[in-house]
Amino acid sequence: MKWALYALGLFVALIVLVFLIGSSLAGHHTATRAARFHQSPETIWGVITDYSKFPQWRKNVTHVESLPAVNGKPSWREFDKYNNALPYEIVEWTQPRRLSARIADPNLPFAGTWLYELTPQPDGSTSLRITENGEIHNVFFRFAARFFIAYTATMEDYLKALGQKFNEKTAIED
């Protein structure tokens, strides 16, 4: 019986510690990752804005639903293998150089935007830089994102998947 009480006490202490650490972390973060591709900005733009084809090259997206346009710009919902849905809307569209997409569900434990910047390089390649301006409202999720998931993991996966789409090896840059 004493052992069970000690175990319960340790578990509660761990939960409190995670809560305190998560509460002390900033709710907002900015993270950036980039990669170069041997493609034109127009080619990359065509792929990253054709959300209906995301499941063909992004392994974590199983299907996509079109949603009504918001302010004349595209909006869609992505589903993962667990059928979790994330709605997105475009907030900036400057073809083929700059795109900004926002998570469009205020009830999620996180929010934010991804800014995609495509820059042609002298050698004919294109640099794609993604900047995430994110907010994590839930302190437990904030703790997990900081210590276990990494703020840049999704961007890195996205850039690697894009490289695979083009049959290119992707070197991730800060």
Spans of model-derived segments:
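Hydrophobic ligand-binding cavity/cleft-lining segments
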Residues: 2-69
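Hydrophobic pocket/interface hotspot
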Residues: 43-48, 54, 90, 99-101, ...
